[in-house]
């Protein structure tokens, strides 16, 4: 999926509002995913998955940092996310559907925290962005 110039502008503007909260939003999205889609917990058997756990917060920061990296490289997502794609495909072997589930939870989290900025156009752009990130992360599964 190709991001238009308007999509890129919307994604950058929305992510600038996230600011230093990317890790917190990432952790909240993970908690939403674990609650809404309990089968996703199987990838984290060694984690304390309780609300506010240090392990979920740490992984949320990794998610937030990866998305911040992606926002900074909208014109070369495959290059920017290559190592992360390798990790998830070859070492962690995460089922690709889980990226879609996390994307859904990220959109929900952003909508809750950025209600005035989460317009239909921004929602659509963020959805396209997260879909593109998911596609890149699963590209090495083949």
Curated annotation (Swiss-Prot):
Modified positions (Phosphothreonine) in chain numbering: 9, 109, 135, 138
Superkingdom of the source species: Eukaryota
Biological process terms in GO annotation: hydrogen peroxide catabolic process
Modified residues (Phosphoserine): 4, 50, 103, 125, 139
Molecular function terms from GO: haptoglobin binding; heme binding; iron ion binding; organic acid binding; oxygen binding; oxygen carrier activity; peroxidase activity
Database matches in Gene3D superfamilies: Globins
Annotated positions binding heme b: 88
Gene Ontology CC, one term: hemoglobin complex
Pfam family membership, one: Globin
CDD domains associated with the record: Hb-alpha-like
Residues modified as N6-acetyllysine: 17
Globin domain segment(s): 2-142
Modified residues annotated as N6-succinyllysine in this record: 8, 12, 17, 41
Keywords tagged on the record: Acetylation, Heme, Iron, Metal-binding, Oxygen transport, Phosphoprotein, Transport
Residues the record lists as binding O2: 59
Expressing tissues: Red blood cells.
Family: Belongs to the globin family.
Function statement: Involved in oxygen transport from the lung to the various peripheral tissues.
Record's subunit section: Heterotetramer of two alpha chains and two beta chains.
Protein name as it appears in the record: Hemoglobin subunit alpha
Organism: Equus asinus (Donkey)
Gene: HBA1
